[in-house]
Amino acid sequence: MSAKKNKKKKPIVIKTSACRKIKRSDGLKMKWVQEYTFRGFLEAITSRFGNLKAYSIFGDEEDKFISYNRLKWGAENISTYLLEKGFAKGDRVAIVGESCPFWMMMYLGITYVGCVAVPILPDFSQREMEGILKESGAKAVCVNVKHFKKVEKYAYSNNLMVVRMEDLTQIPSIPEGFTFENAPGISLKEHSHNYTLINTSVPSEDDMASLIFTSGTTGSSKGVILTHKNLLVCADESSDTYVKVKKGVRVLSILPMSHCYEFTITHLLCLLQGAEIVFLGKPPATTILMRAFKEVRPHVILTVPLLIEKIYKAAVLPTLRDNPKIAKLYKNPLTKWIVLKTVKTKLISTMGGCIRFFGIGGAPLDETVWDFLYSCHFPYALGYGLTETSPLIAGCGPKHKMHKKGYIGKPVKHDHVILLNKNEDGVGEIAVKGPNVMTGYYNNEELNKEVFTEDGYFKTGDLGYLDKHGYLSIRGRVKTMILGPAGENIYPESIESLINNMEFVQDSLVVPGDGGLVALIKIDLEAMQEKLKISATDVKDEAEKYLVKLKKSVNEQLSTFSKIADTELQEKDFERTPTQKIKRFLYSRKKKEEK
């Protein structure tokens, strides 16, 4: 045989550029899909990746996975079942539960025929869930066993179809002697699909796909209307700005899928490019994460800042601060790079050794942690956006040369970002217009008039700065910005970043008080007790004394108008939204004005 015949064939690789063929009259250029609908999405991913692994769960057996073909097959069966039960385009189906393959299969089955998915964050209370089911007009709810009790009363008393998420089985009722977990029912995913029926209910790009009720830090929850086009344009275009993955890349899914950042970027974007997504399947405790990192060896992780901040405070900061030799090397500009390179290698090894993209979004990243990641060239990437923008507005990839210190990155393609009411420093409210921006808030015309400008820009409520190269820097929230004694703008997030990097500090919140700024500070009392060798009865008094020293140290680093006037020891954990933002509205220290 000739050498030519023995030569191995090169694997076929679908290049991004080869997919960029479809130009549209609206200026968009589709890369991965034929149309921006979830029907088009499923057709695209199965035609290219058919029998490849789409989903698996950490800890499951190797052969227990869902392929791209199986995902589409199950979704079509669900679609058929819904239509046979009288559901029509626009009807709402709620999804409540932790992330798993059947969560996505249910979502795709709902939207494949133009029904609307109502993802509900599993951390919501029973009262909040019942309110969302009522306000959305849901005709069905898919819920896992863990959260069933939160919806049981409302669902059955209002004749909603109830589907058990663990096996996608409708449970019409729970017979005596059974529980929701083992009650008999009718399988949706095994139901025979009917293409003739499915093709009578075809969604369009501008149809509502998701109705998402946000969990705000201000205490109000709003229904965000996102269309098929909103979500899929964001996923399609974000592969240029934010994250590019290849076929077969392993992605570790940690966040709830009802979180728009997780849904659009981890799932839609990565499925469009043939990734294998592995669900953590358990609460992200440190021990579980370490095992998952070691066994899954992910290439891609997307998470909220709290995770990397915890890793930094637990593994990195003590090394840089408490080891005298390393601390000395780190402070010396000539030897700092040696420490950074060593710590970076250790950090990547801790995450399984294969990490190529560590996406951070959903909340502001601590400035000290950000500076460390930037300095050691860790493959992180920041993303900025809101549920209302599907969610990505701006970001950058993990390559160091794409990063600019203090800046999130550039706006995604087709998004136009402007700043409203800029001050003398060029800081203003970020406003955005683009195909990923929501059509509006559900049943709230008054609020829609308030958040959209006359020329169609959505006002984000965030303060930002755009440099001459188009890089966006986030400076804080309009509603959390505090006015100083002479009208100065004070950004509490910057002060909190300084406090959080002090020894023993677990968390902090800076709020306005009647006598100036008040810092509520959560101290790690166990760590303090252990290091100072004091008794449990004395540690609280010691913590109060420590706050006095902390206040002095932090104030030395602040301008006169943003100095802390008082500190309080925060004994309980701060209440947070499911995206780990502190609910600031609960902690005001200003006395109500007397009427």
Report residues per predicted region.
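Conserved pre-ATP/AMP-binding loop-to-beta segment of ANL
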Residues: 50-53, 183-213, 220, 244-250
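Conserved ATP-binding/catalytic segment of the ANL
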Residues: 425-484, 501
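Conserved AMP-binding/adenylation subdomain of ANL enzymes
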Residues: 232-250, 257-344, 354, 379
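Conserved C-terminal "lid"/linker of ANL adenylate-forming enzymes
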Residues: 482, 507-510, 515, 549-595
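Conserved AMP-binding A3 loop
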Residues: 65-69, 209-235
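Conserved AMP-binding/adenylate-forming core of the ANL superfamily
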Residues: 54-100, 104-108, 125-130, 228
